[in-house]
A protein has these predicted regions:
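Eukaryotic helix-linker segments that join adjacent hydrophobic helices
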Residues: 1-42, 50, 54
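WD40 beta-propeller repeat blades
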Residues: 33-198
């Protein structure tokens, strides 16, 4: 069996136990009901290396890190604007957030402190971010003129400091490039195959 988490309009996070044989009927009973948020929950994200640890982000601009095994909220912290995307790094020691204020934030999930922040993309439509396996950060968003755009950033990986295409330590604000794509109106989805090296 394995567990799946769902975000909900009713301000809760629900954890479901999925049998090895798969879902064969409509599931109506969750195994854990996590209650903290005051507005709808839009993001749930399992920790990449710690068992039973789940992150949730709601429309109340709050983030909660849960121990799903006990149903306990381990840590809560607020962000200044609505969270549009969240992504753990590979060992779970950092979380990236993109917010409605156009900023990308690198947060320490042990204390909720914002370690670094920068403008992700200048457009008013939302941006998304993902950690790549090599430690770089890939973002998608829009220009001021609503042209789709992507960016590659180096948020503090000393292994790349001698490479011409990468910038020095702790500079999320320095993009490695922001090629404009086109004028399409739809959001770009982050597509990343984690087990392949970029």
């Amino acid at each position: 069996m394995f567990c799946a988490a769902s975000a909900s309009e009713d301000c809760t996070v629900k954890v479901w136990q999925i049998p090895d044989s798969g879902v064969t009927r409509t599931m109506t009973e969750c195994v854990v009901d996590l209650v903290f948020h005051q507005r709808r929950v839009g993001i749930v994200l399992w920790h990449p290396s710690a068992q039973n640890v789940l992150l949730s982000a709601g429309s109340d601009n709050n983030v909660c890190i849960w121990n799903v095994g006990t149903g306990e909220c381990l840590l809560t912290f607020g962000l200044p604007e609505l969270v549009l995307s969240a992504c753990w790094n590979w060992d779970g020691s950092e979380v990236l957030f993109t917010c409605k204020d156009k900023k990308i934030r690198r947060v320490d999930p042990r204390d909720g402190n914002v370690e670094e922040e920068a403008v992700a993309h200048e457009g008013s439509k939302g941006a998304q971010a993902v950690y790549l396996k090599n430690g770089l950060v890939f973002t998608t968003g829009f220009t001021k003129h609503s042209e789709r755009q992507y960016s590659l950033r180096a948020p503090g990986d000393d292994a790349f400091k001698n490479n011409l295409y990468f910038y020095q330590k702790h500079l999320l604000s320095r993009s490695l490039g922001r090629p404009d794509r086109d004028g399409g109106a739809g959001h770009q989805q982050r597509g990343h195959v984690p087990h392949l090296r970029p």
